[in-house]
């Protein structure tokens, strides 16, 4: 039931907050409370995942925004703008862009319309970072996109699980996004892809291994 679902969500939220608070060691290990939002349509078609991270654990909304509210990332940004006005600071970090099928850094919005100033500013406010590498490979660039770069094949996925080849490489990689952003800026639209980069493990446990031989996830 809806009541049972809400109760389970509340328990999970409290457990997440407690885990972040318990593990936090200033100057040694920094933790944040957050969750994963997905607007994926199919498994590897518009595979869009974002990690939503809250600035602190003392002021987190009772109900978080999920794909049940909307699969449109702009609606997530609207929600983040709304809670920011109430004093709740957060950011969203797109990850796994390398298997997004070109959707992560598209020149169109989720509904197919062209990127405009409203879209660009909302994205800039809410997504200042993008994940460039993790266990599923790097999202910097691909040999087909950077043909003169002999290192462009570093840790890139060659196919999706269950598929023979990757498709729609343009719009899936960070370097390509930077170029697209500069193109939009040249056309007089704010650059929505002016972001910094992070690396992650995607282990979902805040840990990883030191060597490839003992890698775990």
Show where each model-derived region lies.
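Single conserved hydrophobic/aromatic residue that forms the stacking wall/gate
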Residues: 1-8, 12
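A structural signal for short coil/turn segments at secondary-structure junctions
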Residues: 24-27, 87
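Glycine-rich, aromatic-flanked loop segments that form ligand/cofactor-binding clefts
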Residues: 28-39
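Charged catalytic cores and adjacent phosphate/nucleic-acid-binding surfaces used
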Residues: 39-90, 97-217
């Amino acid at each position: 039931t809806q009541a049972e679902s809400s109760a389970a969500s509340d328990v999970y939220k409290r457990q997440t907050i407690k885990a972040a608070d318990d593990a936090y060691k200033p100057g040694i290990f920094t933790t944040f409370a957050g969750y994963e939002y997905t607007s994926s349509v199919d498994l590897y078609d518009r595979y869009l995942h974002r990690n939503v991270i809250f600035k602190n654990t003392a002021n987190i909304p009772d109900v978080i925004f999920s794909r049940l509210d909307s699969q449109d990332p702009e609606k997530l940004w609207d929600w983040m703008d709304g809670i920011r006005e109430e004093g709740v600071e957060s950011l969203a970090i797109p990850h796994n862009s390398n298997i997004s099928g070109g959707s992560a850094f598209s020149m169109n919005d989720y509904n197919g319309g062209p990127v405009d100033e409203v879209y660009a500013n909302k994205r800039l406010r809410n997504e200042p970072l993008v994940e460039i590498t993790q266990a599923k490979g790097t999202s910097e660039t691909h040999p087909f996109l950077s043909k003169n770069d002999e290192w462009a094949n570093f840790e890139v996925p060659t196919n999706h699980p269950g598929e023979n080849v990757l498709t729609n490489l343009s719009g899936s990689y960070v370097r390509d996004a930077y170029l697209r952003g500069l193109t939009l800026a040249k056309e007089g639209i704010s650059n929505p892809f002016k972001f910094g980069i992070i690396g992650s493990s995607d282990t979902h446990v805040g840990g990883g291994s030191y060597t490839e031989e003992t890698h775990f996830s």
